[in-house]
Amino acid sequence: MHRRFILLVAVFIAVLGLPTSAFAHAVLEANTPANDELLKTAPTAIDLRFSERIEPVGAIQLFDGDANQVAVGSQKLVSPNVSRTPITGTLAPGTYTVAWRALSSDGHAINGAFVFHVKKRGPNPEGIIG
């Protein structure tokens, strides 16, 4: 019993000593366009920068203010933690919502959404902080 307790304490101490990144999942650190940014011209791509390496699978969807999907190209990794997705559709003045999904290098799926505005601000969609 005493040996089992010592082993349990040793494992507990070893786990506490691991770097916190061993338990962390990637998080979105920055995006271009920025959340709630008012742009003078339409962007040509959406860049997402994560806190750690992500897998080369993921998805981005772009919606206009009427919830119509706007065409985007294939998402590509431009560095181990940055993805770029070209915008192939036309962006008229208004508010746009970006919904994204990514996969951390540890296999954890992450997702989120943000808005940006082209030439004029419109109302932000419900549930999207902006």
Describe each PLM feature range:
Residues 1-9:
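Bacterial N-terminal signal peptides that target proteins for export
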Residues 10-14:
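Classic N-terminal secretory signal peptides
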Residues 25-130:
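N-terminal soluble domains immediately following signal/targeting peptides that reside
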Residues 19-21:
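N-terminal signal peptide c-region/cleavage motif recognized by signal peptidases
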Residues 1, 23-26:
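Absolute protein N-terminus
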